Amino acid sequence: MQNPIGPYPGRQLFSGLTSEGNPCLVYLVTGRSPESRERKAIQMGSKVAIGPLGATAYDPLRHYTAVMNDNSTGIAAVTNGIQTEAIFETYRLLYNVKTQPTKEYLQIIMEGAAAEPDSLHTPRIGAIITSGQGEPVSFLSIKRHDRPALAFDVRMQKGKVTGIAVYNGPMETPGPFDPDSGLPELELKGTGALDIARFLFDISAAANKGQDIRVCTVGAVLKSGAWDVAIVNAH
């Protein structure tokens, strides 16, 4: 099996349910340039950050909090940039004040975050897992520079995750992911956080100019009221 987007998704996330019915998410980071590959995922309590290797200088577009989770509410957010905390705290507020969560809140935050200010106008992507009327719900979103932010409901089916990516797959000429062609789905292999992180890492093997583009994957599974988080780093 190969990544459903193609060899170069840039950064990519999926959310859904494991085969046991547990809410889960998994996040992939890849990079074509040496600077983009010189990164790793770092777990810091209930957060996972994408940080530099060694003495590499801090870059706010490459180094950021990617995942935040909370056991007391069962909420988890994952994104490719500065929008993670805003999304997480918004849905935690909705949970605490007992307001029904909808995708529109995610869409508004993503529109405000805008695309990344780089030469490729890199899209921002994000996902949230929370609960609505006692059942797990999840929403995905993408913000491209050339269109308003879009948000989508995830069909929560056992053993399946739905995803969204930054780029549309080609290695040499990456363009922004187009959700109009449909969102990719995966049938998960494994039920634990490390299982799904390793699964996405393995199916995303690809090289640019002889160099493996994979940086890391992060998997998270909500089991028995607690988030199990695992990381697979290339370095």
Task: Annotate the PLM regions.
Residues 1-235:
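Conserved short alpha-helical segments that host acidic/polar catalytic motifs at enzyme active sites
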